[in-house]
Amino acid sequence: MRVLVLGSGVIGTASAYYLARQGFEVTVVDRQPAVAMETSFANAGQISPGYASPWAAPGVPLKAIKWLLERHAPLAIKLTGDVDQYLWMAQMLRNCTASRYAVNKERMVRLSEYSRDCLDELRAETGIAYESRTLGTTQLFRTQAQLDAAAKDIAVLEQSGVPYELLDRDGIARVEPALAGVKDILAGALRLPNDQTGDCQLFTTKLAEMALKLGVEFRFGQDIQRLDFAGDRINGVWVDGKLETADRYVLALGSYSPQMLKPLGIKAPVYPLKGYSLTVPITNADMAPTSTILDETYKVAITRFDNRIRVGGMAEIAGFDLSLNPRRRETLEMIVNDLYPRGGDLSQASFWTGLRPATPDGTPIVGATAFRNLFLNTGHGTLGWTMACGSGRLLADLIARKKPQISAEGLDISRYGKTREVAKQGHTAPVHQ
């Protein structure tokens, strides 16, 4: 059975790999010259299942108003006049209740924990190397109020059986010695000892090499133009003016997925959440982080690779704008100087931005659609790296009609209600503008 995977980020590549392991004949198509050249290229590098939480949370609407007035805010909104932007924000606000937060977080943690297990298994079987560390993630709280507010997350961790530690200032210095000199500015921390780190772009490149050995074909530099469909089936995908056909189709185009789906009558509430990162060469290993630090105040992660520090985070709701905002760089540099002033050389840092495909409830869209041969693997937001292996393996099981190892409840697009409006038979408009 032939499967055509659209998109070669970490999600598309993981989908292709796990499909090939199940015996499918897989082709991956992407406009870029190699895998992981867009959102997967320079993300924060953390694999943190226990910290899998939706942005839509109780209290966020009031916090958002405050953040809009701050210079170093973790969230910024640039109104584009796009109706989809307004609809997405309205849906997000509706998910900012305690009950919705609990449901959404459980779904995210369920998939993230499974994905971490899949990654562990993959690493044990293949020895795949991507500058990985398994030294945990430490969430830093600068105020007592932040520490107290972590109680709701801890309750979900306990319910899900995720190990954790609450740390005082001395405990922070024990697990992250380079923070000993600044521990007095912190109120405490929440540490998840089983979390991991690694270079997502390097991992995706190595996984693609392994997929090639399983027979996967990667076709780069090709423009995915439109889908042809009739009734409840996809007839093919127009790629560079040629109709490519398969038995099954997987859409893993990240933030661009809705553009492809909308003409089919499928309304996928995925919107780009722009993030930024700095990659800083380490100058003093003893003064650099040992694993991943999450700064709760600024929603920024600081992650240790072999000889580099990756600093990533923030969220701009600004459409498909990929310009580099110097104020965001200023914020990232400020946080590094605050916590690790002697760890790396900021003058040699590279600055990057990417569009994370976010859903309003935080949970990705993984599974079947109203079209019998079209499947989605998109909408992972800031957790594409954390959820990649689990999402790819889950999707492969669903396509193979095997019982997945975890419950797929609440993960496919049907959770948003009516999954397809009446669409005119034919094809979509180009997805990549």
UniProtKB/Swiss-Prot annotation:
One GO cellular component term noted in the UniProt record for this chain: plasma membrane
Disulfide pattern: none
Necessary cofactors: FAD
GO biological process, one term: D-alanine catabolic process
Binding residues for FAD: 3-17
UniProt keyword annotations, A-Z: FAD, Flavoprotein, Oxidoreductase
Pathways involved: Amino-acid degradation; D-alanine degradation; NH(3) and pyruvate from D-alanine: step 1/1
Pfam families attached to this UniProt entry: DAO
Catalytic activities: a D-alpha-amino acid + A + H2O = a 2-oxocarboxylate + AH2 + NH4(+)
GO terms assigned for molecular function: D-amino-acid dehydrogenase activity
Similarity comment: family membership: Belongs to the DadA oxidoreductase family.
Function, in words: Oxidative deamination of D-amino acids.
Name assigned to this protein: D-amino acid dehydrogenase
Species of origin: Pseudomonas putida (strain W619)
Highest classification ranks of the organism: Bacteria, Pseudomonadati, Pseudomonadota, Gammaproteobacteria, Pseudomonadales
Gene responsible for this protein: dadA
